[in-house]
C-alpha cells in the first residue's frame, strides 16, 4: 500500500483525479442492507444466547443508528478524512485477502511480498483509511486485527515516507495519529462486512460428511471475528465522537 500511494504522489494527478468518483448509490438503503444480511447471518448462530448478543450490538441506540445512517456513511467516504487533515486519494475499495496475490520465494513457497492487488471495479477517490478497515475487518481474526491496529498506521507512514525520500519527495502531510483517528469512524461503517461476507462463503457450499465438522469450526471462527468487530465498533460509537449523526 505504501508503494501504491508513493506512485500516486509521484505521478501527475491529472491521470486519476476526477476520473474515479465514489459510487454514492452504494450507501443508499442501508436499513435494508443491514436487515437482509443480518437475517441470513442469524441462521448460522447456534443458540438464542448468541442471537441476543448480536441483536444487542446491531440494535444498540448508538451503534445501530450509525451503521444504518446513509448520511454518516457518505460523510466517512467523502469528507471525514479531509476533516482529519488527510488528502483525498485513490482507494482500492475492496482490499482484502482474496484480492491480494503474494509472490513465491526461491523455494516456491508463498512469501510476504505482494505481487498484485486484484479486482479494481470499485476504485474511487476518497478516504485511504477505508482500505485499512476493509483489509483488517475482512481478513483478520480479532486478536490479529487488534494487534495490527497498534502499529499498522505508524508502519504505513514510515514505509511511505521512506519510499518518497528515495525519490526526492517530501513526507506526507499527515501522521499515523491522524490516520488512526479517522479509522474509528471508518471502522464503524465496516462493521457489517464480517457479517455479510460469511453467508457469501457458506450459503452455496455443500459439505461432505467428512467436511461437516471442519466447516462448522470455520463458521464458529467467522462468528467470533464478527463478534470482536461488533465489540470494537460499539466502543468507538460510545466514545461520543459521532453523536451528531444520531439525530
Model regions and ranges:
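ATP-dependent phospho-/nucleotidyl transfer catalytic cores
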Residues: 3-92, 102-111, 218-222, 226-233, ...
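Short, flexible/disordered secondary-structure transition segments
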Residues: 11-16, 146-147, 163-171
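Catalytic activation segment of kinase domains across protein kinase-like and atypical kinase folds
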Residues: 89, 96-138
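Active-site activation/catalytic loop segments of kinase-like enzymes and analogous catalytic loops
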Residues: 122-166, 190-211
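All-alpha amphipathic helical-bundle segments outside canonical DNA-binding/catalytic cores
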Residues: 168-189, 221
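Long, cytosolic, alpha-helical-rich C-terminal regions that act as interaction/scaffolding modules
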Residues: 184-246
Amino acid at each position: 500500500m505504501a508503494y501504491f500511494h508513493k506512485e500516486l504522489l509521484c505521478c501527475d494527478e491529472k491521470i486519476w483525479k476526477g476520473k474515479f468518483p465514489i459510487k454514492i448509490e452504494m450507501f443508499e438503503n442501508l436499513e435494508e442492507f443491514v436487515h437482509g444480511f443480518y437475517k441470513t447471518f442469524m441462521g448460522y448462530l447456534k443458540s438464542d444466547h448468541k442471537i441476543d448478543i448480536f441483536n444487542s450490538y446491531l440494535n444498540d441506540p448508538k451503534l445501530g443508528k450509525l451503521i444504518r445512517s446513509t448520511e454518516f456513511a457518505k460523510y466517512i467516504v467523502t469528507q471525514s478524512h479531509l476533516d482529519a487533515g488527510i488528502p483525498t486519494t485513490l482507494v482500492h475499495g475492496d482490499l482484502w485477502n482474496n484480492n491480494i496475490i503474494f509472490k513465491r520465494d526461491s523455494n516456491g513457497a508463498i512469501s510476504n511480498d505482494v505481487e498484485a492487488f486484484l479486482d479494481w471495479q470499485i476504485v474511487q477517490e476518497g478516504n485511504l483509511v477505508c482500505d485499512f478497515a476493509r483489509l483488517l475487518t475482512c481478513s483478520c481474526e480479532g486478536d490479529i486485527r487488534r494487534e495490527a491496529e497498534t502499529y499498522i498506521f505508524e508502519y504505513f507512514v514510515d514505509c511511505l515516507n521512506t519510499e518518497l525520500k528515495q525519490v526526492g519527495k517530501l513526507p506526507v502531510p499527515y501522521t499515523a495519529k491522524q490516520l488512526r483517528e479517522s479509522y474509528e469512524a471508518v471502522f464503524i461503517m465496516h462493521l457489517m462486512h464480517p457479517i455479510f461476507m460469511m453467508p457469501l462463503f457458506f450459503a452455496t457450499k455443500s459439505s461432505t460428511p467428512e467436511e461437516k465438522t471442519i466447516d462448522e469450526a470455520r463458521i464458529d471462527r467467522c462468528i467470533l471475528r464478527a463478534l470482536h468487530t461488533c465489540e470494537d465498533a460499539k466502543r468507538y460509537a460510545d466514545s461520543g465522537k459521532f453523536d451528531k449523526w444520531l439525530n
